[in-house]
Amino acid sequence: MSSEQSAPGASPRAPRPGTQKSSGAVTKKGERAAKEKPATVLPPVGEEEPKSPEEYQCSGVLETDFAELCTRWGYTDFPKVVNRPRPHPPFVPSASLSEKATLDDPRLSGSCSLNSLESKYVFFRPTIQVELEQEDSKSVKEIYIRGWKVEERILGVFSKCLPPLTQLQAINLWKVGLTDKTLTTFIELLPLCSSTLRKVSLEGNPLPEQSYHKLMALDSTIAHLSLRNNNIDDRGAQLLGQALSTLHSCNRTLVSLNLGFNHIGDEGAGYIADGLRLNRSLLWLSLAHNRIQDKGALKLAEVLRAFELTHTEVVERRRLLLEKGTQERSRSPSSSRHGDSKTDREKSQMVGISNSALVDKTDKTQTMKTPKGLGKKKEKSWELAKKEEKLGSGQSPTQGTPKKEDATKAGKGKVTIPEQKPSRAKGIKIGSREKRSILLESELVVEATEVVNPLLEPVEHRDGKVFMPGNKVLLHLNLIRNRITEVGLEGFLATVQYQMQFSKAKSASKGPVGLLWLSLAKNCFAPQCPAYAIIQELMLPRDPIKAKLREDEAMAFFP
């Protein structure tokens, strides 16, 4: 027992607590040292610090620039830039080929591999599809983004990589989840792009505030705008109509506007018609698949024929006429000075020619006459020259008078392009430097007066009211699948008949002739409706596409 009791005391395991204390002290010192001296982690060899996207200089290759900028923005997974697939021509295999494929192709009987499944689902991955002008990666012509959300940061990437694309013509965004904020950012991006960008398509992007009219601002360069399937209602149509034209402003760049597959009703159609009253740039308008009934159809038809000006429009017309008169009166002294300078130069040339002719005549008659007669001839020639010089400071009987008449006519009458063409042709024939400079000045005046306010167009006064000829610039109007009945058809029939008479009267002179294509099919009337049949008959010879087809058929039958 004593040995058993003394054993624990003599056991070598007794000093363990001491050793534990010493080891604990060591560990605490190590932890303290680790806290005091943090370990320095060296970056791997070849890895650089992340670069900011502002420092990157774009190369003009969209695929490279977009990938690099997305990486610098912190994107790990981003859409790829691919060529837009083109539809292949339909291929109909023969019976022998189809039998051989069923016998020889093992893929038809076996299960699909993992690679084939991945290749199938690659189609649904977000991509940026591009069309190239040539087989050059720098010649991107159109951009298509379809079915994935475009965020604010992606638009920031586009603001860097799209401006270097010098041949970009169109941007198409289909169901990309735009908001009013991202639309504003997108609109701010457009002026940075190339001047060749004229077409924008925003389809399937409904916005709560319906701020699509911002794309049609006065400083916008968009010529073709498509806003299909955006749930645009009458409130959005009001904003679009005001963007087309108001009493004091007008969009002069938009050529085509597609508002199909929206929720525009009679009230919205009336707002669009109000925008067409003073707009003289829109050639193509589609309101297909909307909710327009007879009231809205009649408003659209009314603006395309002679319509009555409102009181505010009449007042604005008078103000514009007064301004035009004061401008012409202020221009008339400068134009007369130009005319006088022209006649002075021409008369000085005529004086030189007459003097040389007189000298030649005196040389010829020197041997025929006595010195006294020669002296008399010389005196007479100098008197004639002095008289012509005096006339040169005033008016020339041959050239000065018609020039002054032209100047007074130009000051009194309306300045138009056809009236300026003869003067330009005369200036080109003369060919002197001074006349070329005057010609350039006249061209600048013509360009400034090219865009005439529609309120200054010729009007007709009837029963104390002022009537404008109507919008003859719109060539294409699509109203398929609305809710128009025979009542609305009568309004369009009157419009077509009026435009036919107007075009016959204007056949000799060039200018807008009115609608060339009008589509009213699949509305709330029978196809055999008499008014619809008459409209179709009247519009058939005006349709340029069908007229071209008839010409081709005639050439085929009678080569």
Swiss-Prot record:
Gene3D superfamilies noted in UniProt: Ribonuclease Inhibitor
Residue spans of biased composition, Low complexity class: 1-18
Biased composition, class Basic and acidic residues, residue ranges: 28-38, 324-348, 380-391
Listed InterPro entries: Leu-rich_rpt, LRR-containing_protein_71, LRR_dom_sf
A Pfam family: LRR_6
LRR repeat locations: 172-193, 196-216, 221-241, 253-266, 281-302
Region (Disordered): 1-56, 324-427
Top-level taxon of origin: Eukaryota
Keywords associated with the record: Leucine-rich repeat, Repeat
Protein name as catalogued: Leucine-rich repeat-containing protein 71
Organism of provenance: Homo sapiens
